[in-house]
Amino acid sequence: MNELLSYSSELKHEANQLVVSSNLLDLLREYGCLLSGESFELNVMTNRIINFYVGNDEMDEESIFHMGYQLTKRFSPYKMIFANEKDKYQWSVYMIQKGEEWKLDISVLPENIVKGKVKKQELLKSLFTEKKRECILFFKQQSGYNRYYTSDHVYKAVLEDDIHDDMSFFMWLQRQKKVNQQT
């Protein structure tokens, strides 16, 4: 197994321990339908950040702050950030677990949006091969990741457009940028 796959597997193992030992999934399911983020679910983690999406059309501020209280009790974070945006509540939870810094991003969205994300994630999962997983991990390790391009770019390039080397990927990104500027 190459180094990127090995590191990603280690992160996934640590993340599973964190999620299971805290009963986090049970807590989040109390607030709506739940989806674990792509990097965690698709086993392409490159850092200690886990995204979760909770589908709930009726969430109010009292409930979201109760969720925050429950997260605080479970993790004793050193920092939490709350955002109340149009059609979205979000908690970012920063903590140290077993000597490592972790971040949980928990977004509460309308249920139909989360269900759409579930379908998209199932499609992505069906397109995965070990070779494509390696390519995704390689592109997610580059210095421009999250600054110039996102995981959505990486998944589209590798899984849909069969991009598999860095030169082709960066040319693909330039084409995407031009297409987006024209629309």
For each feature predicted by the language model, list its residue ranges.
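Helical scaffold of the NTase/Pol beta-like nucleotidyltransferase catalytic core
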Residues: M1-G37
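Active-site nucleotide-donor binding segment shared across nucleotidyl transfer reactions
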Residues: N23-F65
